[in-house]
Amino acid sequence: MTGAHPDFCMFFAATIRDTGGYVKREELALKERFLLRFLEVAEQLQDGGRFLCRKEDLHPCLNDAQGTSPFDAHYIYHTAWAARVLARTRPASHIDISSSLYFVSIASAFVPITFYDYRPAPLTLGNLRCKRADLTSLPFADESVDSLSCMHVVEHIGLERYGDSFSPQGDIAAMRELVRVLGNGGRLLFAVPIGGVAKIHYNAHRIYTYSAVLEAFGSLCLEEFALVTDRGEFIAHASEAEAQQQKYGCGCFLFKKQK
């Protein structure tokens, strides 16, 4: 590092600390270019004193200059799908079990939602209440919930990832609870990883087959099935054959309990 700019030496030391000593040459070159650019434009960035601009406040974002905006296809699409279902069905109120906080915080703008989670979230928004519940033993009477969702959740139950107890059939218990509490004529929005082969990636999640999900909810009627593919594509009206072609897709099931 002899002859290097002192600020780059500072960056290099921070990089070594943050990476545990392993640093790619490309990463160092990228940080050096960033630092040189900052030194070049620092005075202009202050805009005549409108902003304070110091090297100790640097926050390098070095991998965001891409041609398209990256996103998590599972979580963008399944929550968008569910919000559209609620916008279409317009229940008087809705109960969600441990799904995405982004989903409940946005959908509660047009449907009152009570959100239950093993690890309750301290959200403070109108039309949204947050409470604690164990999905394998829900605090509701039989057939008492008219509109219910549980998305990208059941695949984790019993795998100890979130502090829950080890239970190889915890997911089965959870799905039985969803069926138990769903009211006659009520709808369940359900999403899990889906593929052609049922697998467990301990302790992250399970992957289900289309037929296994339908079997678990055999007493319910499937109204709609959407799919997020391995390639990140969304199919609004998907088939079992398309689900079987995936390794780690996201199956979005809309079930109804017949009266």
Language-model features, listed with the residues they occupy:
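A short acidic, Gly/Pro-enriched loop at the edge of an enzyme's catalytic core
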Residues: 136-148
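N-terminal accessory regions of S-adenosyl-L-methionine
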Residues: 1-93, 201-232, 237-242, 246-254, ...
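Class I SAM-dependent methyltransferase SAM/SAH-binding core
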Residues: 88, 93-138
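Short conserved AdoMet
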Residues: 108, 183, 218
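A short glycine-rich, Lys/Arg-flanked "PGG" loop and its adjoining helix->strand segment in the class I
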Residues: 166-187
